[in-house]
Amino acid sequence: MKLTDDNYYGQAASEQYFSVSQYKDFMKCEAAALAKIQGEYNSPPTRAMLVGSFVDSFFEGTLDRFKCENPAIFTRKSELKAEFRKANEIICRIKDDSLFMQFMSGEKQKILTFEMFGVPWKMKMDSFSECICITDLKVVQNFRNLPLWRYDLQGAVYQKGAELCGYGKLPFYLAVATKERVPNLDIFQIPQMTLDIALREIEGNIEHFADVKRGFMEPEYCGVCDYCKSVKQARIRNYNELLEG
């Protein structure tokens, strides 16, 4: 299956390929990840995700289309809601920063497919500078929580994917803008040792996740996510459970 911008996020592509986001879904809850792949469950996009997509679309040159396709970002007076006015402010801040713009000057949304650890993968890079680096754009609340989102996993897959596709082993950077009152900007390089550790982690987990995806093993239910709550059956519990921990 040849992937394009039109079918990259489609169900058929999700069924055939692993991606970083799908891998992370399996890390959180195997049952929810499988239901999402099979088209039985879809978590609605959060406001934070829409803000990130708003900024992404500026670099892709599709901001006008994004606005047309997402009327919920506007008030009844056809003005941008507060979060998206902040996104506009972030874009203006980024445009004035030469280093940030340099890192985001590569080929936009380049798609690669490859086999890694015995399973097919797909990836889509925000900014690909051939022979130089891979850069991914992130719009976050603040810098402090950046490691909690496990972008090291993304960097590991993107670096290895580019290498397997013949582009060499390229450094991976995060071009990060914050949604603070005064937007902050910086470029973060994820160290090679961190990427190597993340890749080994993926190698250790992917066979099990692939077996669940293929139907060879039953998925585990985390019991706490929205999907698990939506399919659970009521049971009798001890009230004192709620007093523990």
Which ranges hold each PLM region?
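Short histidine-centered catalytic/ligand-binding loop motif
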Residues: S43-P44, R76-E79, N142-R150, P191-M193
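Hydrophobic/aromatic-lined pockets within catalytic cores
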Residues: F59-L63, V139-N142, E163, Y167
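Secondary-structure boundary elements
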Residues: F100-M104, S129-I134, E163-L170
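Short amphipathic alpha-helical face segments that pack within enzyme cores
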Residues: F54, L153-G161
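Metal-dependent nuclease catalytic regions and adjoining charged, substrate-binding loops involved
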Residues: F84, P147, K160-G245
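Metal-dependent nuclease catalytic cores that hydrolyze phosphodiester bonds in DNA/RNA
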Residues: M1-K124, A234-L243
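Non-catalytic protein-protein interaction segments used by genome-maintenance enzymes to assemble
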Residues: L112-D152
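Hydrophobic (often cysteine-bearing) scaffold residues that line and stabilize catalytic clefts
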Residues: R47, V51, Q154, A198
